[in-house]
């Protein structure tokens, strides 16, 4: 089961290239002798690649949410061209004032398009968007915006509903375990859609949730999975950024429907499907 993560990085980058290098006709009182120099400078700026920064909440592992975003970054370079954009990224940026510091440094380094890939970056990005109107900001899963800041997400809840249906048909214990990070809108949407899907095929289903309060914490994910298995869950899923739940399901002989990436590499027997952000 695959879903399309519409980062629109390539399109956004190209749009920004033209928007940010557009010439302003105001103040055209420069001396005629200086006009050739100004024209040359404008041409040079127009030919420079757009600098794009990506801020990641977790490391780029073999699988997971951050890995899928980085695949999108590399895809943008391939499709737009290295002569048009250059990218940089910072991993393991917490959803604290550190995010503002990292993004501000990216701006100081000349990045004109910033992708903030985690919900908790929202307020910091909105603040910086107001400070730097000539920089474009793309924020994942949030709801605040500015003239130069927009949001992006996918209709992942549709896939969650289908995954719930599959889990509801596969379980023998009628207990499904769900490892979740934070009770934010995106995560709650996923839990609700998954539960509705499961109950549509098996009204007796119980969906039990364990909160980790972390996007990336493999030991917590493992412990949470073990807790849910101990409570009778024979099918697991997760909204966190690790493969630990899939690994725990594999080790316990249970079933798993991973989120973000295909995790058959760590759960070849346990994985019955995967929601892949593609």
Q: What is the predicted role of each segment?
A:
Residues 1-10:
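Bacterial N-terminal signal peptides that target proteins for export
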Residues 23-278:
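A residue-level marker of the well-folded mature domains of exported/periplasmic proteins
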Residues 18-22:
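C-terminal motif of bacterial Sec signal peptides marking the signal peptidase cleavage site
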């Amino acid at each position: 089961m695959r879903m399309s993560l519409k980062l629109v990085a390539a399109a956004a980058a190209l749009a920004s290239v033209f928007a940010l290098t557009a010439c302003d006709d105001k103040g055209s009182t420069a001396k005629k002798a200086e006009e050739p120099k100004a024209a040359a400078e404008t041409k040079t700026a127009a030919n420079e690649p757009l600098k794009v920064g990506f801020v990641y909440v977790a490391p780029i592992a073999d699988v997971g949410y951050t890995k899928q975003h980085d695949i999108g970054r590399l895809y943008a370079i391939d499709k737009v061209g290295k002569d048009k954009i250059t990218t940089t990224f910072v991993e393991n940026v917490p959803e604290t004032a550190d995010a503002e510091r990292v993004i501000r440094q990216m701006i100081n380094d000349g990045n004109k398009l910033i992708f903030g890939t985690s919900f908790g970056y929202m307020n910091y990005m909105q603040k910086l968007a107001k400070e730097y109107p000539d920089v474009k900001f793309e924020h994942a899963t949030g709801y605040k915006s500015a003239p130069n800041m927009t949001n992006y997400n996918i209709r992942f809840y549709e896939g969650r509903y289908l995954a719930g249906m599959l889990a509801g048909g596969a379980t023998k214990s009628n207990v499904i375990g769900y490892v979740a990070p934070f009770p934010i809108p995106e995560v709650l949407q996923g839990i609700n859609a998954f539960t509705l899907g499961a109950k549509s095929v098996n009204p007796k289903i119980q969906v039990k949730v364990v909160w980790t309060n972390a996007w990336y914490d493999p030991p917590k994910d493992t412990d949470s999975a073990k807790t849910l298995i101990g409570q009778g869950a024979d099918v697991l899923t997760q909204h966190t950024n690790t493969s630990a739940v899939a690994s725990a399901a594999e080790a316990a002989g249970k079933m798993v429907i991973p989120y973000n990436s295909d995790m058959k590499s760590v759960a070849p027997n346990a994985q019955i499907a995967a929601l892949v952000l593609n």
